[in-house]
UniProtKB/Swiss-Prot annotation:
It comes from Crocosphaera subtropica (strain ATCC 51142 / BH68) (Cyanothece sp. (strain ATCC 51142)). It catalyses: a plastoquinone + NADH + (n+1) H(+)(in) = a plastoquinol + NAD(+) + n H(+)(out); a plastoquinone + NADPH + (n+1) H(+)(in) = a plastoquinol + NADP(+) + n H(+)(out). GO terms for biological process: photosynthesis, light reaction. This is NAD(P)H-quinone oxidoreductase subunit 3. One of its GO terms (molecular function) is quinone binding. It comes from the Bacteria.
Length: 120
């Protein structure tokens, strides 16, 4: 047998990571109960009969607020570890964080001027 310099472990893990979901999905498909009537395909809403259609159109403002929220939520996720380790990182990390915050402030000003934060 020849030596792959440790790549056989990576290949083994890749194979295992590929086989486990395939086996789990196959087992669930084999073991699940089949059949069921038309009631099984209806929407369940707190035990009440659904009223109206499921295809309603949401206002685009909800999506704009959600996108702005996600952007600044990700900003918080990136800035929190930096703030925790601030005393050990030094001046270069401080300057990098300031550049990151400046880019996000520019994005906030852009969204504000485009009217993404207004509900009217």
């Amino acid at each position: 047998m020849f030596v792959l310099n440790g790549y056989e472990y990576v290949l083994g893990f890749l194979l295992a990571c590929s086989l486990i979901p395939i086996l789990a999905l196959t087992a669930s498909k084999i073991l699940r109960p089949s059949g069921g009537g038309p009631e099984r395909r209806t929407t369940y809403e707190s035990g009440m009969e659904p009223i109206g259609g499921a295809w309603i159109q949401f206002n685009i403002r909800y999506y704009m607020f959600a996108l702005v929220f996600v952007v600044f939520d990700v900003e918080t996720v990136f800035l929190y570890p930096w703030a925790v380790a601030f005393s050990r990182l030094g001046l270069l990390a401080f300057v990098e964080a300031l550049i990151f915050i400046a880019i996000l402030v520019v994005a906030l000003v852009y969204a504000w001027r485009k009217g993404a934060l207004e509900w009217s």
